[in-house]
Amino acid sequence: MIAGTHPLPDTESPLYELHAAVQNFLQNTEKTIDGRLTEVGISFKLSRELPQIIEDNIEGFCHKLIGIAGLTDMDYNKMFWAVHPGGPAILDRMEKRFDLLPDKLNASRIALMDYGNASSNTIVYVLEYIIEESRMM
């Protein structure tokens, strides 16, 4: 979640704006990601089927999100990608599924390399790398 308010026009400008959101619940996947809170922290066990489950469902999810956002151009390489890096297999399958150029998931791959899959907060690292990439352009 990214929260904020209206920026002060003379001194601030938003880095991101959320225009649409969507979620999908996939039946019979409740054991696919198993999180445990213990005395030493949180640990997760990811099912070996997770990359395939994502690959099988990501296109429908993206079509739904793109439709809600009111976009019509389905050229995935023209889109901005901020993907939670659940693991290399997940990123590889997304890249293949959408025929993405290798740089489209670059921020996700760097975040995964630097921090690993640090649960849901990993997406914040991805967004930070995207900001850094945009400043270099």
Kindly give the residue locations of the regions a language model identified.
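Condensing-enzyme catalytic core mediating Claisen C-C bond formation in acyl metabolism
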Residues: 1-67
